[in-house]
């Protein structure tokens, strides 16, 4: 993809700075998951434009520890749909094509309008293409006393 090799690093660096600043300065309350209180990534996006009545969103998503996702990300596309819906720019049934920095894309649609504990929300659908990048085999030792793993609740990042 032309130009990506020369612009990804600054986008990643700015994205990580924005994510850190958001986590330091902003708060939010998720309507159904009270334990989710951090910003995970930053989506840097061009203004929406339309082709044949379909919204087109070009973005780059900077993820920890400072990489650019190869996809437009389902979370990012869902958030963009919700934001555009809240601003009145998209309505129930409207479609959006989310395109990543390398041109991969998701076909997104607002399927339903919801109320989640008093917060207006949407239920999006996201469709795209996936490729097998590897296969893995997981085995359990029959003598392992913790075959299902373990969790120490006081060691998760939001508790430190």
Where are these regions (language model features)?
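Conserved phosphate-donor
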Residues: 25-62, 67
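A structural-propensity feature for long, helix-poor, extended segments
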Residues: 92-134
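Short, small-residue-biased leader/transition segments that mark boundaries at the very start
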Residues: 2-9
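Structural signal for terminal/edge beta-strands and the immediately following C-terminal loop/tail
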Residues: 129-160
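Conserved phosphate/ATP/ADP-binding segment of small-molecule kinases
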Residues: 10-33
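Short helix/loop capping segments that flank catalytic or ligand/cofactor-binding pockets
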Residues: 4, 81, 134-137
